[in-house]
Amino acid sequence: FKLYPLTYTELEQYPQDLDFDSVFRTYHLKRKKIDQERLYELLWTGFYPRVYDKHLDSYKWYENYIFTYVERDVRSLLNVRNLRTFEHFLILCASRSAQLIDYSDLSNALGVSLPTIKEWISLLETSGLIFILPAYFENFSKRIVKTPKIYFSDTGLLCHLLSIRTVKQLKVHPLLGSIFETFIVGECFKRFY
């Protein structure tokens, strides 16, 4: 099994409901007013427990996390000749969070083969950095062939990869809507996977 970053309800210590419908209930929100500033701060800081347990500077922590991930994990799991290209791939994926995956576009932008891009996406998914949300259609065949969306499992990591260095920058960032969508979909995903 995979351990994803904390959910908003875990971090804010709300009671945990295990059924899907509970995600859409608002009774637990009445107990505590959601502070918009706190929400921006959480989106920027992300939800990895270590940042909160150790009271770490989240931006530096994500920098080290990415370096360790790329240097250790990627190097050992894949035969990546140019780690810098993989880092650019991570950044391009971040810029496409909450969007349809366009493998060809990633391939062309990086000058890397399509099978390599698919292998790298699979690695990100297997390691829990991203998750893929299949298209939903009542027709099962359409679900299989339609393009899925890519989401990062943590908004702090996403913000770091997008070079968002402060909460103030997050508030005016052109991808704020995608970051917020990543947060909402991620909350649903992390509760049930």
What are the functions of these language-model segments?
Residues 1-9:
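A short helix-turn-beta junction within AAA+ P-loop NTPase domains corresponding to the substrate/partner-engaging
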Residues 52-193:
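Accessory nucleic acid-recognition modules appended to NTPase machines
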Residues 8-11, 157-158:
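A generic structural signal for short hydrophobic patches within well-formed alpha-helices
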Residues 14-23, 68-69:
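Conserved AAA+ ATPase "sensor/coupling" helix adjacent to the nucleotide-binding pocket
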Residues 11, 46, 89:
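A residue-level signal for conserved active-site and pocket-lining positions in enzyme catalytic cores
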Residues 28-65:
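Amphipathic alpha-helical "lid/sensor" segments that cap RecA-like P-loop NTPase cores
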